[in-house]
């Protein structure tokens, strides 16, 4: 329970202090916001006031003739008009402030500036508010709805993704899926969630996820999420799993054995695989986001090596960069040749070419297991493919900066970058491209839809009908969507 606040009398020295909290810089002097408290609540009003002021908005503590925008939450047009009539009358000739729904405020905060007022924002006219689609128009599967890279509910989705990640660290598949699916729905909504009523009818919003969102809407933070992010368990598991070659099971074993830092791992090299040793050796570089420019530079290097080895072969950038991301933690490439069979044995030659240039810091080669392609298609339970591939750490050349006299020494001439090279036959390329583009959750949902709604098995090798023993053929990603009866979503809309 919040402590009772002492009533401050008008004109007292304390009243001046209480109302003197606006920030030093007001970026939008023509906009003066008053947050009406009745349905909003005192703590939420205080939070929203701090948020707006931190972004340069002018928020007034008292209703007066200076107010240009009154913002209300969970209030009908009729209630808003009654509220305004009950307030002290403004001086003659003063314009009435706009009565606006909280959605105008949240959209303005997201934009970093006042957004244009639309009819849906105004409370003066009793029109039905436009809210995000509910279950009738919000498909249950992430592969049925667009998920843009930039969406309207980042704060909310990231909180649920934190809880999903923590559940994954505990091998709690049920909680992981519940939070992941709810977060994915938020990414597909066409506008910000400003009130809990907007979640009604949306798929995958159970009691727990709804409670988290409610706390975030009311207080701007969620105690459970905060505790998870600050916990030693979560931070250690996150640290260990960011090391190349370390999965959840290994990280958990190390945690149970009392290990907490990377230095402790380095002191016990006997417990590390070669891949993990390389991950620790180049950890500083590998934990630094890879820029799109770096990914494109790597593509040029790999394309040159591939052309030298097999003219006519193509190299395609996949993963998050294909979905529109400007940075990532690794770079994935698919290599193929239009004449099926020409790609066999290509990767070792490409790696040899890269090694001769001194670009390979580490690589682990996996030969192809495509001898029985029909068998690979029937592996419905496996998300791993059988393509020829190499998990690498490449040294990407960096422009050398000359050191000035007395300055720090020049920067390193290369940067370690995680790279996956995958070789696929041309007949399986559309499925491989779809699978390696992601996102991981989008692909999981696509396989679930194929299995549960169509009775088909989908993986990076192809699409298979287990009843009719039939293998489907496709020449593009669009073909795969069409075979599944789905509307095609471009890569930029697959950030589920």
From Swiss-Prot:
Its cofactor is Mg(2+). GO terms for biological process: B cell differentiation; DNA recombination; DNA repair; somatic hypermutation of immunoglobulin genes. One of its GO terms (molecular function) is metal ion binding. It catalyses: DNA(n) + a 2'-deoxyribonucleoside 5'-triphosphate = DNA(n+1) + diphosphate. Mg(2+) binds at residues 330, 332, 420. Na(+) binds at residues 241, 243. Residues 323-332 are annotated as: Involved in ssDNA binding. Its main location: nucleus. Residues 23-122 form the BRCT domain. Keywords: DNA damage, DNA recombination, DNA repair, DNA-directed DNA polymerase, Magnesium, Metal-binding, Nucleotidyltransferase, Nucleus, Phosphoprotein, Transferase. Its EC number is 2.7.7.7. It is found in: Nucleus. InterPro entries: BRCT_dom (IPR001357), BRCT_dom_sf (IPR036420), DNA-dir_DNA_pol_X (IPR002054), DNA/RNApol_mu (IPR027249), DNA_pol-X_BS (IPR019843), DNA_pol_b-like_N (IPR010996), DNA_pol_B_palm_palm (IPR028207), DNA_pol_lambd_fingers_domain (IPR018944). It is an enzyme of class 2 (transferase). The record marks 435 as: Responsible for the low discrimination between dNTP and rNTP. Gap-filling polymerase involved in repair of DNA double-strand breaks by non-homologous end joining (NHEJ). Participates in immunoglobulin (Ig) light chain gene rearrangement in V(D)J recombination. PANTHER family: DNA POLYMERASE TYPE-X FAMILY MEMBER, DNA-DIRECTED DNA_RNA POLYMERASE MU. Belongs to the DNA polymerase type-X family. DPOLM has a reduced ability to distinguish dNTP and rNTP as substrates, and elongates them on DNA primer strand with a similar efficiency. It is able to polymerize nucleotides on RNA primer strands. This is DNA-directed DNA/RNA polymerase mu. The lineage of its organism: Eukaryota, Metazoa, Chordata, Craniata, Vertebrata.
